[in-house]
Amino acid sequence: MMRLRGSAMLRELLLRPPAAVGAVLRRAQPLGTLCRRPRGGSRPTAGLVAAARLHPWWGGGGRAKGPGAGGLSSSPSEILQELGKGGTPPQQQQQQQQQPGASPPAAPGPKDSPGETDAFGNSEGKEMVAAGDNKIKQGLLPSLEDLLFYTIAEGQEKIPVHKFITALKSTGLRTSDPRLKECMDMLRLTLQTTSDGVMLDKDLFKKCVQSNIVLLTQAFRRKFVIPDFMSFTSHIDELYESAKKQSGGKVADYIPQLAKFSPDLWGVSVCTVDGQRHSIGDTKVPFCLQSCVKPLKYAIAVNDLGTEYVHRYVGKEPSGLRFNKLFLNEDDKPHNPMVNAGAIVVTSLIKQGVNNAEKFDYVMQFLNKMAGNEYVGFSNATFQSERESGDRNFAIGYYLKEKKCFPEGTDMVGILDFYFQLCSIEVTCESASVMAATLANGGFCPITGERVLSPEAVRNTLSLMHSCGMYDFSGQFAFHVGLPAKSGVAGGILLVVPNVMGMMCWSPPLDKMGNSVKGIHFCHDLVSLCNFHNYDNLRHFAKKLDPRREGGDQRVKSVINLLFAAYTGDVSALRRFALSAMDMEQRDYDSRTALHVAAAEGHVEVVKFLLEACKVNPFPKDRWNNTPMDEALHFGHHDVFKILQEYQVQYTPQGDSDDGKGNQTVHKNLDGLL
């Protein structure tokens, strides 16, 4: 009786509008049929809180909105402004190209709408089993565009454009990302040409995303290096606010162009190796790289000339001395490329035999590629001031010339001019974070995918940044923070977390070592919170956060959604879960699988799908040692019992396992699409 009452209530909930759901839930008895009452005892049932999580529609639907995403308007004009104006319309040929990864439908007629049965629910299912794996794959694997549509739509027939953009931003991608240009162009064209411009049906959505489907699928499947990017950025914002309270330090004033910056300026930008972006504070204010350019020009020199040639002229050791000392090592070479003497020598190695104008253009083009074509400028006023107040650097230059540290035929005065020019190159926190991410990504720019630097150049650059990048504070920074970094007198700190992300922290007030006060505090706090230190143990860490791991909440939701789809007989939802490489054998707290629930409810289509398409183990035991066959027999579902019995001859039991080994082949096929 309880079971009939619960089923009727569920139907009522699904048919009522959202406004009526709350009142029904308050009157409702707990849904007991998801975890059946065992024979000979009782079992805990889910409360209202669990019920509200069973389906996104009950909890309000949608994704958590991050900062900057919540206020996005749904009006066509403001969405157009968000997507950017202008741009070349996509070619007609692009609109008609085949969907990547698409396969022909298993049978004619509309499929995939929530609640409908698929090919496994009719006589065609038997033909598929007889025909083998090929047709099963066709039934299991519709196009990736379909999967993406249903992931965002959450049961609706159309997707509002602003909802898609908000969901996209929550993954860390930006609408200005060069990799998404075709998608954004098509969205803009759709908004301008359709009558219902702010809504996308499935066909329009597929046209918009098909050229960028792999990247978008990775984003929404949370396959980026930082899966829960919204949670990570909330931590970054907290660290930013903590560092903002730091006072002290003095703005560099040896030239007027540096002295004019307000000590209250403070910005942090993050770019991961997958192109996830986050910025907070004064991240669009241009400032000069100053000494932050030293590792970049060293990387250019090694990329062009090789390690062996470059280190004929400059060493690799920390000097233990001030960065502008007139001092060489025992071989009469500068100690490393991060002190002024070494940086001047490295400058002389770039594009030898070419005039300064061509050299400067070459380096600017290189830095533009590293920054993904984001802002890289030049401050002529800073250059003039540096040259006029550069007596110490001229002294170092003449000392190097006297010790024959330059390649033969080098014009020392011309090289110093070029050196001052490179120090006067301007960036913003946002563009510099992409440069740092290029170093973190092995020389590939994360937002363009272009290889800019060789692996050798990246490895050597990060090694020297780690040991020599923070002036006289380098040893302490390596000890406490343990990450490659380079600071500059303009207040910037270029920070690299190898294989994860790059960051630029900028605040003009400097400590007595010449490093940004707020930037140093931020870096210390970051490594205290996250296990990014070079020697943090990734397997046995106790208290630190690892943003590279997916949180437990997502796994809990995964189990709830899987079992609820099996309970309601929603084969379309199960197909989407299988497409997203979900473990279809995962269990709840009673060790019950989706097959247990489907067998108890008598959903023939779901049982067939799980057995024939997903190849799940038909013999899992729950905490009461009941198998799906026991469930079907107990509730009188003889057709399900017969299917499970027949499937025994096709399946070799692997034992009760929680790791979903029976799904490995399907998972490999799914991941192969990406």
Swiss-Prot record:
Write down the top EC class of this protein: hydrolase
Post-translational modifications reported in the UniProt record: Synthesized as a 74-kDa cytosolic precursor which is proteolytically processed by the mitochondrial-processing peptidase (MPP) via a 72-kDa intermediate to yield the mature mitochondrial 68- and 65-kDa subunits.
Q: Where does substrate bind?
A: 291, 340, 386, 393, 419, 471, 489
Sequence ranges of Low complexity compositional bias: 89-101
Q: Which InterPro entries match?
A: Ankyrin_rpt, Ankyrin_rpt-contain_sf, Beta-lactam/transpept-like, Glutaminase, Glutaminase_EF-hand
Q: What is the effect of changing residue 320 to P?
A: Loss of enzyme activity
User: Where is the site Cleavage?
Assistant: 72-73
Look up the transit peptide and give its residue range: 1-54
Query: What does the record say about activity regulation?
Result: Isoform 1 and isoform 2 are activated by phosphate, due to increased affinity for glutamine. At phosphate concentrations above 10 mM, isoform 2 is more efficient than isoform 1.
Q: Where is this region: Highly mobile activation loop?
A: 320-327
Keywords, A to Z, come to: Acetylation, ANK repeat, Cytoplasm, Hydrolase, Mitochondrion, Phosphoprotein, Repeat, Transit peptide
Single Gene Ontology BP annotation: regulation of respiratory gaseous exchange by nervous system process
Catalytic activity, EC? 3.5.1.2
Residues bearing Phosphoserine are 657
Span list, region Disordered: 56-123, 652-674
Result of changing residue 394 to S: Impairs tetramerization and promotes formation of homodimers. Impairs activation by phosphate
> Where does the record place its ANK repeats?
590-619, 624-653
* Gene Ontology terms: cellular component: cytosol; mitochondrial matrix; synapse
What the entry lists under Gene3D superfamilies is as follows: 1.10.238.210, Ankyrin repeat-containing domain, DD-peptidase/beta-lactamase superfamily
What is said about its interaction partners and assembly?
Answer: Homotetramer, dimer of dimers. The tetramers can assemble into rod-like oligomers (in vitro), but the physiological significance of this is not clear. Interacts with RAF1 and MAP2K2. Interacts with ATCAY; the interaction is direct and may control GLS localization, negatively regulating its activity.
What is this protein's function?
A: Catalyzes the first reaction in the primary pathway for the renal catabolism of glutamine. Plays a role in maintaining acid-base homeostasis. Regulates the levels of the neurotransmitter glutamate, the main excitatory neurotransmitter in the brain.
What family is it from? Answer: Belongs to the glutaminase family.
The Swiss-Prot or TrEMBL note on domains reads:
A highly mobile activation loop at the dimer-dimer interface is important for enzyme activity. The C-terminal ANK repeats prevent the assembly of the supra-tetrameric filaments.
Q: Which NCBIfam families does this one have? A: Gln_ase
From the Swiss-Prot or TrEMBL record, give the protein name: Glutaminase kidney isoform, mitochondrial
